[in-house]
Amino acid sequence: MAKKKSKSPGTLAENRKARHDYNIEDTIEAGIALRGTEIKSIRRGSANLKDSFAQVRRGEMYLNNMHIAPYEEGNRFNHDPLRTRKLLLHKKEIQKLGERTREIGYSIIPLKLYLKHGQCKVLLGVARGKKKYDKRQALKEKAVKRDIDRAVKARY
């Protein structure tokens, strides 16, 4: 049975499929505006970054489709699990990312959600989608590397 990969101590959620589906060209750290029940739910590990993306609207950046499960003890104060959340960045950073996304084929995707000094942060990646043959090529290269590593390990 394969070992389950352990997350680094501050990591709350990770978009592992993103590196398979996209070529990540640049990364940037952003804060995220959350409600009380959202941060409590995230600290419990109930966040999912799959299929989420960021976009610039009216000079502000928003994170869409990030699922945060409702907090069990939140009763009527609970949040909408798929609500659009505002990302906290400097104006120059937002403009730079906006310019990159206007180029055809680029998008901004969240790679990781983590805590830093008690604050929830999102690692965003400026990415270009991979074609199906690119994904196959990457899997072949990974398999070849694994075989080489096994052969070298068996030798010693």
Swiss-Prot record:
Residues that span the membrane, as ranges: none
Pfam families assigned: SmpB
Principal subcellular localization: cytoplasm
Keyword RNA-binding: yes
Role this protein plays: Required for rescue of stalled ribosomes mediated by trans-translation. Binds to transfer-messenger RNA (tmRNA), required for stable association of tmRNA with ribosomes. tmRNA and SmpB together mimic tRNA shape, replacing the anticodon stem-loop with SmpB. tmRNA is encoded by the ssrA gene; the 2 termini fold to resemble tRNA(Ala) and it encodes a 'tag peptide', a short internal open reading frame. During trans-translation Ala-aminoacylated tmRNA acts like a tRNA, entering the A-site of stalled ribosomes, displacing the stalled mRNA.
Compartment annotation: Cytoplasm
Similarity comment: Belongs to the SmpB family.
Coiled-coil positions: none
Listed GO biological process terms: trans-translation
Gene Ontology cellular-component terms listed: cytosol
Protein's name in the database: SsrA-binding protein
Alphabetic keyword roster: Cytoplasm, RNA-binding
Domain of life (superkingdom): Bacteria
UniProt source species: Staphylococcus epidermidis (strain ATCC 35984 / DSM 28319 / BCRC 17069 / CCUG 31568 / BM 3577 / RP62A)
Gene Ontology molecular function, alphabetical: RNA binding
Keyword set includes tRNA-binding: no
